[in-house]
C-alpha cells in the first residue's frame, strides 16, 4: 500500500539518464551520498504524479549516483524518469542521536531571538562548505518582512523544541 504523500521525505532526485541500458543519474540528498542506495523501494514524485520504483542496484559515480531500477532497460524509457523526486516514508529514516535533527523536522519551525522577537519560520536549509544555513522567511506576527539567512551552528541555535514548533536563536534582529 503506498504511503500518503504528506508522510514522505525527499532523499534525492533523478536528474538524467546514465549510459544506454536504462540506468538513471541520481542526485542524492543523503549524507553520505550513497546512503540513498540503502532504500530499495522508492516513491517517485513529479508534478503531483506518484509512482513506485524498486532499486535493483546502484553505485557512487563522482558526486552523483548511477541507479538501475527494476523494469527500466532502455535509455529512452529512463529519460521519462528525469525530474522525479525520490521519496521514502519518514518511518524508514534511521533514528538520530539526541540533539540531532533531519532538515524536514526543522522546516516550519518558528525562529525566536533571545529578546523573544519572532524572526520568521524556517522555509528550507542550504548546504554550504562551512555549515548548513537556515532560510528564515517572514510570517504572520514576525518582527518585519525580511528574509534572513542564519547559520545552523551551536553558536547561533540555542534550543529546539519540536513539540512547540520553535527554535531559539542568538541572532541580532538587525542582521
UniProtKB/Swiss-Prot annotation:
Residues 97-175 form the PRC barrel domain. An accessory protein needed during the final step in the assembly of 30S ribosomal subunit, possibly for assembly of the head region. Essential for efficient processing of 16S rRNA. May be needed both before and after RbfA during the maturation of 16S rRNA. It has affinity for free ribosomal 30S subunits but not for 70S ribosomes. GO terms for cellular component: cytoplasm; ribosome. This is Ribosome maturation factor RimM. Keywords: Chaperone, Cytoplasm, Ribosome biogenesis, rRNA processing. InterPro entries: PRC_barrel-like_sf, PRC_RimM, RimM, RimM_N, RimM_N_sf, Transl_B-barrel_sf. It is found in: Cytoplasm. The keyword Acetylation does not apply. Binds ribosomal protein uS19. It comes from the Bacteria. The PRC barrel domain binds ribosomal protein uS19. It holds the Pfam family RimM. One of its GO terms (molecular function) is ribosome binding.
